[in-house]
Amino acid sequence: MTWVECGKFASMQERRCLAGLMLTIALMCPLLSWSQATVKGFIRSKDSGEPVMFASVALEGSSRGVMSDIEGFYSLTRVPAGQYTLVISSMEFEGVSEVVDVLDGKIMTRNYFLESKVIQLGSAEVNADRQEQTTKVNMSIETIRPSDLKKIPSFGGSPDLVQALQVLPGFISTGDQGGQLYIRGGSPIQNKVLLDGMIIYNAFHSIGLFSVFDSDVIANADVYTGGFSAKFGGRISSIMDIKTRDGNKKKIQGRVGVSPFGAKLTLEGPLKKLGTGGGGISYILSLKHSYLEQTSKVLYDYVNEDGRGLPFNFTDAYGKVSFGSGNGSKLSLFGFNFSDRVNYQALSDLGWTNAGAGGNFTVVPAGSAILMNGHFAASNYEIRLQEEELEDRFSSVNGFNFGLDFKYMLGENAVEYGLEVVGMETDFQTFNSIGVQVGQKENTTEFAGYLDYRINNGDWIINPSMRMQYYSSIARFRPEPRIGIKYKASERLRLKLAAGLYSQNVISSNSDRDVVNLFYGFLAGPENLQRNLLTPSGEVQEVNHSLQTAQHVISGFEFDLTERFNLNVEGYLKNFTQLTNANRNKLFEDNADNADVPEVLRKDFIVETGIAYGADVVLKYEDRSTYMWLVYGYGNVDRWDGFRWYDPVFDRRHNVNLVVSQGLGKDKAWEVSARWNLGSGLPFTQTQGFFQPPNVVDGIATDYVVANSEELGIQFAGLNEGRLPAYHRLDLSIRREFEWENHTLECSAGATNVYSRDNVFYVNRVTGERVDQLPFLPSISLDWRF
């Protein structure tokens, strides 16, 4: 169905609202470019050409001051005419100053290249974080930088984003082997992952301990666990916005790493060296490959009783070329191919691939104070599960997305607005436990526009925003207002609040009742959906659309105990007003012959509602050589399926994460890190007994004396009314760097599950066999940089 065809079914009022938003956004550019004096530009590293993030930029003799963003861009607006000294300072780079003559109504561009300097470890990040906390609402957001990844003991000695995510507030992992990440009551499909603006449909490998991203190419990752502004949409729980860095524009560099779990290679360098006026062309290439299935048979044959080791394999390739211009405008083109394969004892074979290409760009108009960013991308994701004596399961997503974002600084205030288009074709085919086919093929396109205004007014920071979302396949228009507020009660105490409406039109083939299910398929806007839902009050609620929807309310405070000790407390409520789940109760085909059969027995998908609430407490300390991160999370997730309230399999009541990293030695060349995790037991459905189902294939003529069934029936207890034992695990690592000439060798040793805690993963109901999560796994890794 095309956009024009869908428009025929949208109401006149909805089309007028959407058209009005588009017109308003289009008119913002000239309105915001009115005659003012503006000083803007980019700050980059003189050594590599990379952006200098979070540098302080100020005009001496005035109240004007800002920080550079993750692209190194700064903009000082509403500057009165006159002569000033422009001062740039950074904890990582040597500062610079320049006398500038600001003319009334003129826009002045000044780009700077800063030289690196020796700094105290962590001081730059501490300073940048403190600045961010006093100028932005920053509700339920955690920023992960490359330096943060190294502070967490890593599985196999190689830092990985997924291991950093697991220690963030609100994150729950259901297992070391095939577990998924759940964020503040939201399931994995309700979490959007963006790579340089591109939607990544499966960002984590089946083993659950590795992501598809190479930590060496990550520049910054912003993780929003709720209450995010209108800039982001299409998901109802969380956003992970990951940015990659450009290759070195001055010299060729490389990195080779090996461990018992896998190997990786990173190469980067200039295709056209960075000149004195900027510009330049660079590349960066990354390749990761796991050989864990082979090495685990020798080194970790004790993991499984059959000695087969760990049956997980994956390969990730990524490449990027960046073109820069003298005025700071930039174009980057990238491509990737991620693959994953799991082979369980020759009984099942699961594999998926995710390949795509895209680009992003930054445009700095010479006569405007507006910064324009854009992205475009297309990808294909396919997953297939083959099992003995069962039909194959298959799912695919062919998708594209395009977006434009505009940013304008109004003194200490900021306006952001933009447009986004997302399209996808989904194909999904599977079978339930009794062999009934469940599947659908869909095409959908989403159109969105947003306006985000951040107001800094004394002690108040107010961030209202509005997102207009149109789902063309179902002709559904949704205005989604959002708000963020922060009040600076004192120099050390800041109170904050956020709320908003959210929606999405994509679901997962997994049910939230599945304990383990590596088959992760996608479907957009399912049509075979029940049309009535019995509410907890006994009323029948009509289901008039297939969207998943939610409301967020989050409040909390930040308190600076000292200059390096910070306390952050947040309480959250996510009201999931409509959820879609795979129907595990389907017994009949949905056709005219079965029209009298209840919908819950013939529809492919069912509708649920839910509520998630809890609180997260984060205590952080960081100085030159010591890093400490302590998180306690309390959470409660309840779902209503039209029959009962139940706890989904990821409903963990208590969760604790402690990370400690300590530099040792005169030059702090040694670093010791530890992570301890404690989680209360997850829900599961208990087995009450077994029975032999009667065989009545011949109806009333069946001879019940001899017609015994060969099948085994299971009598279940209440849905997820039981609780597994508590989970806890200690990981340790130690690393040391050796430098000579232009080479660095990093040696690290570590262990996962140091005291080999037997954490239960699941129990086979029929055989009673218990499957535990990963035992004690030691490792040594080498990393050579040149």
Predicted ranges, named:
Residues E382, D427, S472, R492-H552, ...:
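Surface-exposed extracellular loop regions of Gram-negative outer-membrane beta-barrel proteins
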Residues V167-L168, V212-Q253, K264-T266, K273-G275:
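A beta-strand signature from Gram-negative outer-membrane beta-barrel systems
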Residues W34-S123, N127:
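Periplasm-facing N-terminal accessory domains of Gram-negative outer-membrane beta-barrel systems
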Residues N677-E711, R723-D731, R735-F786:
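C-terminal beta-signal and adjacent terminal beta-strands/loops
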Residues D101-K106, S123, N127, Q131-F228, ...:
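Periplasmic N-terminal accessory/gating domains of Gram-negative outer-membrane beta-barrel systems
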Residues G403, E442, E446-Y450, E542-S546, ...:
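Outer membrane beta-barrel strand-and-loop segments of large Gram-negative receptors
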Residues F261-Y291, Y302-R341, D349-N373, Y408-V415:
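Transmembrane beta-barrel wall of Gram-negative outer-membrane proteins
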Residues N456, Y572-N575, L587, N594-P683:
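Gram-negative outer-membrane beta-barrel transporters
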